[in-house]
């Protein structure tokens, strides 16, 4: 189950965008071997809202493009398919039968700014940020160079499947 909640009014959100986001998330999770019913919440917000969240949770006083709040625990360098592929989740891990993977807060305002800066479409940027965040929910990171290379490769492979290029 994918929940999308639009809590901003600076960028128009249409059904096409919401459907593409859901399609990208579903595809990415299948590619990453998530073989259980899941729940992810995506909240579309503006720069002021994401700045406040950054300040509250990361002690960073600026707007960023996307934030991920994973619900599962991962050791450094491990991702979902490494440790949870055949894991027996118990009822305390599930919400109405769905594994709660986490929440995504995405600034559509920042996505629009970055799409112009990088010279590609708003849809491509929003899909990229969604994939990036989903991979974080699955344990991927980019703090170390080797992890960054792996994460970027996965992002590009998924984008390519949807014919979304830079």
Swiss-Prot record:
Q: How and how many cofactors are bound, per the record note? A: Binds 1 zinc ion.
Q: What is its EC number?
A: 3.1.-.-
Q: What class of enzyme is it?
A: hydrolase
One GO-annotated biological process of the protein: rRNA processing
Pfam family, any one: YbeY
Report the domain of life of the source organism. Answer: Bacteria
What cofactor is needed?
Zn(2+)
Q: Which UniProt keywords apply?
A: Cytoplasm, Endonuclease, Hydrolase, Metal-binding, Nuclease, Ribosome biogenesis, rRNA processing, Zinc
**Which residues participate in Zn(2+) binding?**
132, 136, 142
First-listed, main subcellular location of the protein, grouped into a coarse class: cytoplasm
UniProt-recorded Gene Ontology molecular function terms: metalloendopeptidase activity; RNA endonuclease activity; zinc ion binding
Classification via InterPro entries: MetalPrtase_cat_dom_sf_prd (IPR023091), YbeY (IPR002036), YbeY_CS (IPR020549)
Q: Which cellular compartments is it found in?
A: Cytoplasm
Q: What's a single GO CC term here? A: cytoplasm
Its biological function?
Single strand-specific metallo-endoribonuclease involved in late-stage 70S ribosome quality control and in maturation of the 3' terminus of the 16S rRNA.
Spell out the family assignment given in the record's similarity comment. Answer: Belongs to the endoribonuclease YbeY family.
Q: What is this protein called?
A: Endoribonuclease YbeY
């Amino acid at each position: 189950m994918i929940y999308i909640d639009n809590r901003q009014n600076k960028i128009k959100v249409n059904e096409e965008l919401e459907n593409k986001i859901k399609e990208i998330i579903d595809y990415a999770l299948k590619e990453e071997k998530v073989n259980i019913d899941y729940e992810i919440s995506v909240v579309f917000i503006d720069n002021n809202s994401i700045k406040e969240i950054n300040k509250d949770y990361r002690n960073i006083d600026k707007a960023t493009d996307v934030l991920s709040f994973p619900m599962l625990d991962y050791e450094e360098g491990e991702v979902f398919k490494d440790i949870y592929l055949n894991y027996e989740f118990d009822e305390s891990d599930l919400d109405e039968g769905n594994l709660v993977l986490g929440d995504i807060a995405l600034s559509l305002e920042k996505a629009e700014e970055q799409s112009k800066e990088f010279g590609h479409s708003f849809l491509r940027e929003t899909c990229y940020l969604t994939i990036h965040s989903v991979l974080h929910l699955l344990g991927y990171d980019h703090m170390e160079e080797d992890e960054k290379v792996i994460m970027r490769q996965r992002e590009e492979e998924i984008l390519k499947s949807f014919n979304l290029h830079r």
